[in-house]
């Protein structure tokens, strides 16, 4: 028998500035299922995580709420831990990056990098808010795009035209925090010399540690040459002060991944059998896996392994990267009620419904996953209630009535039982590869075969026939054993159902190896319902409650929504100036990603009697570009064409919103036609 594997697993650290939602839960459920599978196989799998608890955003929110940053992160951490526990995510340790372990490790790693010559310093000129007396990160500066003239754009890129620029290039810059006009001020910054590790990273990213599509994307960065990474922020800042640099703090993305190490070290202090260096040392034979979303690949696949290499630690065995969550084919929306918080879901529905649905859709790739709510109801009701639980509910009553609850050891269908046993290695292989959807398909195919066989044997009919009691018990006994096999295969996904099934079966917690054995002449406990069907009305109630969450949040704000404060109405223009802008209705015929562009989508537009090609910086809000195809939008037709490195953009489509995921492409009422002028 082979030695148990030593495996350390992490999920990305949720930011301690807001609630967990169903998009977040995709990653934690995925990770938890994989870790539970490893533990069932007898491996030493350890799952650690923590709240990402540093940064200006946390400091500013705490200030607005009149509490300390420590009070804020403690409250958010408690909320996060409650949500995860109720979703059956079983961390071995859940810590915080604002911890002594993380302070010590961050300082030690920095000092090792400095000693090895991988730290540089140089003055940086950046915007400073004179009212708040703080330097402003790019996202805290708003102004007019220097390229296309669109107002209310962030300090590093324009969501309208996709241009990137330095914050100092913005026209009419304003602090997004105070509204003050920022001033330029020089400050000494600390940099990590990422280019020192370029050769290592080129080799490591092609070593099999990454999915191929992720490695290909990173190759673009590596081929264009790496830049030094700014790892410092100036006071005031909520975080750890850099050693020997008063008033300078580690940038949150330096100490956040070190939080993985800190959480594990915190666990080691409570579990003496665990050796920190055995998992993190340069020559560690343990496996280390990070489950992350595709939006934070650069930090984990470039900066993080370079930091570990430079400080004398081991690198990850692999990064397991997943895509985004959409709901009903579109990005999560607060107004539609599909931006669902974890707690709102839990108030209405069983967490195992979602765990199973995610498992049925998750593959090993980085494709986005769509939570289609109608399909969700149908799949859970059909697969879990109609197939798996149905086997036990069909058979248990006959065993209790006809044999005092004792399951006999007969095997009336050896070929069927053999099929279940022979399927186990393939299902295990799918779990190991994170092909959860394949595992679920194979498990449900077995459930179909079991149900078909039981229906064919019809124990309910046999029970009415004289002298058929032995056959009834044999059929139902095998039915319960097949149900037990399915429970073993589903246990990583459905731990609560498995625990209830174990109680009914009157057995110790099931391991993966138990699929090789059968129950025989075994006393069962009385059967209790294991799972109920999803009621569509409860899904609707969850959606309505999510809309109410939005309304409550809006009601707690001051009168008005603050948009005019953030972006005051521009200087008055005359009608001729407005009339000079030729706005048209455009039909989006095709919408696609732009290779090599992080923020742009390419839109092919029909404007009635002509076609136009437009690049728009709306990718972050529309992870599925095809969802925009066939939609009407507003188009600036007489904007001068702009040559970009990806091609020529012939105009601009109009959108509202602050940016990021909150970009809303404008559409006319139904009945408008491509080419019509907007007046």
From Swiss-Prot:
Group of enzyme by EC: ligase
Residue numbers covered by motif 'KMSKS' region: 331-335
Keyword Isomerase part of the UniProt annotation: no
Signal sequence segment: none
Localization, UniProt: Cytoplasm
Any GO MF annotation of the entry: metal ion binding
Sequence motif 'HIGH' region, location on chain: 14-24
EC identifiers of the protein: 6.1.1.10
Domain of life: Bacteria
Pfam families: Anticodon_3 (PF19303), tRNA-synt_1g (PF09334), tRNA_bind (PF01588)
Protein family according to the UniProt entry: Belongs to the class-I aminoacyl-tRNA synthetase family. MetG type 1 subfamily.
Name under which the protein is recorded: Methionine--tRNA ligase
Organism: Pseudomonas paraeruginosa (strain DSM 24068 / PA7) (Pseudomonas aeruginosa (strain PA7))
Primary gene name: metG
